């Protein structure tokens, strides 16, 4: 009988250790999820900026807006807080690549825009 009492006494306080472990795991998962969601938001931001820059460059290349197509794409990219890495502006189609620094990684996004008949 004393043996059963001794085992029960040796586990006293283990519930609080288990609770701390569960809370720690939950906080770790929440922090990791926040980082993943922030990276996804930054990637979406880069893609939106690439799309806007490509559309602006396509409008400029088609002659609807006066000026340099890649210069216009760089200006739009800068307004969105990203860096223009590449711009290939033709009369009917424009390709744009932008990058965004997110902590220790660099996110890149590409976009293509052009006249309705030229882009499938």
Where are the language model's segments positioned?
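Short, structured secondary-structure boundary patches
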Residues: 31-34, 96-112
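Low-complexity, S/T/G/P-rich flexible repeat/linker segments used as non-globular hinges
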Residues: 2-3, 104-120
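Alpha-helical assembly-interface signal, strongest on the long, hydrophobic N-terminal helix that forms
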Residues: 2-70
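Short amphipathic secondary-structure patches
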Residues: 55-102, 115
